[in-house]
Amino acid sequence: MTNKVVILGSTNVDQFLTVERYAQPGETLHVEEAQKAFGGGKGANQAIATARMQADTTFITKIGTDGVADFILEDFKVAHIDTSYIIKTAEAKTGQAFITVNAEGQNTIYVYGGANMTMTPEDVINAKDAIINADFVVAQLEVPIPAIISAFEIAKAHGVTTVLNPAPAKALPNELLSLIDIIVPNETEAELLSGIKVTNEQSMKDNANYFLSIGIKTVLITLGKQGTYFATKNQSQHIEAYKVNAIDTTAAGDTFIGAFVSRLNKSQDNLADAIDFGNKASSLTVQKHGAQASIPLLEEVNQV
């Protein structure tokens, strides 16, 4: 059965620079390549990934009236994303991200939130019909927390599973933590929230146990090329990553989440399989440059 997924999150226009290495303070370096603008934002990336895995995907986001995101709206339509709840506002410009990728494929990202940061609980309430009919509601932290709380409250009241990707990393209020069914941090985000640095298998377990102890039912800690560690009250497992030559890690985590929620059963009885599917999809993403441009189609993932 096809999963119905609502993504609440950011839409950005990404500007990419390819560099041999990162500059030191006060240093000027030549850029290897300056690429044209691409669609991005954690929310948009996750929506694209979910839709390309052929889940029934609705996206709640906010963009400016500046027209710079019009090409992204076309990308959403091509991906068959329900754009009924995409809001245009004159309050701020469309969000932007400035991304540098070095020779090792690692990236740094600087984000201007723009219209994303004008998302309100009222905007979310206007999308209530989509939320209550979903299997999963997914959010990140590139929109205001009150809007996320509103979405998760609606979801929980109607038996919809909530998924939080706590990125960019920041402290979370208890009001939000109490509404999370599945949390998907990376090592840095997990450490910030739990206070436990992820250095080995035991610290991964300790980290996951922290989230379980505060009432979150399912914990996934993404570990980059080391794969994903997951835990529930009944089971835990380290799922290995697929070994590939990574050239750009941009959107790898977003691809993982989109693929994961597209495959996960509502009962979560296929948790390990859904995580492996997410790992497989993200292993394709890191072999290409760009964010949404690098997110694979379901047919490509199935060929791995």
Curated annotation (Swiss-Prot):
ATP binds at N186, T222, L223, G224, K225, Q226, G227, G253, D254, N279. It holds the Pfam family PfkB. It is found in: Cytoplasm. Activated by a monovalent cation that binds near, but not in, the active site. The most likely occupant of the site in vivo is potassium. Ion binding induces a conformational change that may alter substrate affinity. K(+) binds at D248, T250, T285, K288, G290, S294. Transmembrane segments: none annotated. Pathway: Carbohydrate metabolism; D-ribose degradation; D-ribose 5-phosphate from beta-D-ribopyranose: step 2/2. GO terms for biological process: D-ribose catabolic process. Requires a divalent cation, most likely magnesium in vivo, as an electrophilic catalyst to aid phosphoryl group transfer. It is the chelate of the metal and the nucleotide that is the actual substrate. Homodimer. HAMAP family: Ribokinase. This is Ribokinase. It comes from Staphylococcus aureus (strain COL).
